[in-house]
Amino acid sequence: MRRVVCPGSFDPVTNGHIDIIRRAAKQNEEVIVAVLVNVNKRGLFTADEKLEMLREATKEFDNVTVAKFDGLLVDFCRAHDVSAIVRSLRSVSDFDYELQIAQMNYQLSGIDTLFLTANPKYSFLSSSLVREIAQYNGDVSALVPPYVEERLRAKYAELAKKNG
């Protein structure tokens, strides 16, 4: 069985992420979407909130599961019998960074990284851009799944209320 992992911080998950997950699911028997838990980096959403949004966004795919991990991705891959890592490339600058990570992951574990080029309509899209637009009440409906849009609006309303 070919099992692959799509790792990321997904803060929040975007339509670009979903496009890569969809394409990976078509090409592989099983896809694990793995949310990196980085205790040194404070995101907008908690790991559990990210898992919830990802589960909702990927519920149409029978062969996709969602998990979280901390530590090295290759250790997660070994523990879950993953044969390859799937990463998206939006630009040449993505390639430079991703190639270094892929080579290190291979050196550490022998696990290959498969690169999928981003759909051109999502090549500009990033979670940080979505957060910035949503923070100022901009329209993110074309950038994220509907449930994620709702969660973004609720999160920023909660933060505004908290910060007075």
UniProtKB/Swiss-Prot annotation:
Signal peptide: none
Domain of life of the source: Bacteria
Gene Ontology CC annotation, any one: cytoplasm
UniProt site positions, description: Transition state stabilizer: H17
Residues at which ATP binds: S9, F10, H17, E98, Y122, S123, F124, L125, S126, S127, S128
Transcription listed as a keyword: no
Residues noted as binding substrate in the record, renumbered to the chain: S9, K41, L73, R87
UniProt keyword annotation of Magnesium present: yes
Keywords: ATP-binding, Coenzyme A biosynthesis, Cytoplasm, Magnesium, Nucleotide-binding, Nucleotidyltransferase, Transferase
Location within or outside the cell: Cytoplasm
Catalyzed reactions per annotation: (R)-4'-phosphopantetheine + ATP + H(+) = 3'-dephospho-CoA + diphosphate
GO-annotated biological processes: coenzyme A biosynthetic process
GO molecular function annotations of the record: ATP binding; pantetheine-phosphate adenylyltransferase activity
Record InterPro entries: Cyt_trans-like, PPAT, Rossmann-like_a/b/a_fold
EC number of the protein: 2.7.7.3
Annotated CDD domains: PPAT
Alphabetical list of PANTHER family matching this protein: PHOSPHOPANTETHEINE ADENYLYLTRANSFERASE
Assembly behavior: Homohexamer.
Family statement: Belongs to the bacterial CoaD family.
Name of the protein in question: Phosphopantetheine adenylyltransferase
Organism, scientific name: Thermobifida fusca (strain YX)
Gene name linked to the record: coaD
